[in-house]
């Protein structure tokens, strides 16, 4: 893993995304997680908005649609995870700072203008996957500025019989080790991505309205 990540700076953006996708798919296979996405691709330069259940979400989305993620700044200081995130072009956000949010919006806008996918988790935290919290819409401004599609994606984790499982949930005071134990205790988990119709920022150039529309689409995707 270390050697693979060390090679990332020497790869082209397309090669980096391909490597990220393959590495993520491999990790899911090791953990016994089967990925199901109901769309083969999404339009270039999309701002992906998704509900947030687990640390696995990043690998699930990357295995289907390689992307740059926006993460809270604290992650940068985490052992190994922070280093890996930084090497994979993660955009770090200092939560609670409006000034920094404007800077991050500028970074996201530039990436979208290059045709890159960027993913945010507008709930701002994780849940157990049974519901969706309210969305914070500040970072949706980047899609408006870049005139980029807003792509809602609902993440749901299910057992083979289709029933809900909270095994992948990384919420509360659960440690990463406890989370891993819960995941591997299940012989097979289905990570399901429901890709909603993209939202046009031209039709709805308002962050608050876009937030509500994106959340409604994700709630519907989880219930499906």
Residue spans of the language-model regions?
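A cross-family acyltransferase "interaction/gating" segment
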Residues: 80-82, 130-205, 212-213
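Catalytic-site beta-strand/loop segments enriched in glycine and acidic/polar residues
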Residues: 111-140
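Membrane-interfacial terminal anchoring regions of lipid-handling membrane enzymes
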Residues: 1-11, 18-21, 39, 44, ...
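Residue-level preference for the first positions of well-ordered beta-strands
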Residues: 45-47, 90, 117-121, 149, ...
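Generic beta-sheet signal
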Residues: 72, 93, 121, 153-155
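Catalytic core of membrane glycerolipid acyltransferases/transacylases, capturing the structured
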Residues: 2-17, 28-31, 43-98
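A membrane-cytosol interface segment of integral membrane proteins
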Residues: 91-112, 117
């Amino acid at each position: 893993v270390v050697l693979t990540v060390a090679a990332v700076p020497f790869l082209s953006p397309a090669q980096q995304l391909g490597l990220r996708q393959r590495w993520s798919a491999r990790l899911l296979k090791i953990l016994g997680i089967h990925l199901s996405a109901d769309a083969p691709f999404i339009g270039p330069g999309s701002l992906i908005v998704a509900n947030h259940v687990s640390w696995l979400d990043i690998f699930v989305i990357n295995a289907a649609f390689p992307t740059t993620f926006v993460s809270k700044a604290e992650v940068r200081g985490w052992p190994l995870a922070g280093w890996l995130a930084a090497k994979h072009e993660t955009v770090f956000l200092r939560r609670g700072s409006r000034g920094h949010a404007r800077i991050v919006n500028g970074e996201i806008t530039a990436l979208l203008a290059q045709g890159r996918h960027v993913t945010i988790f507008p709930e701002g935290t994780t849940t157990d996957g049974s519901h969706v919290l309210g969305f914070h819409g500040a970072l949706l401004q980047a899609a408006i500025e870049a005139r980029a599609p807003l792509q809602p994606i609902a993440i749901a984790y299910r057992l083979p019989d289709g029933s809900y499982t909270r095994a992948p949930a990384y919420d509360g005071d659960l440690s990463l080790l406890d989370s891993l134990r819960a995941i591997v205790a299940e012989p097979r988990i289905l990570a399901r991505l429901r890709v909603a119709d993209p939202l046009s920022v031209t039709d709805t150039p308002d962050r608050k309205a876009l937030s509500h529309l994106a959340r409604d689409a994700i709630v519907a995707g989880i219930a499906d």
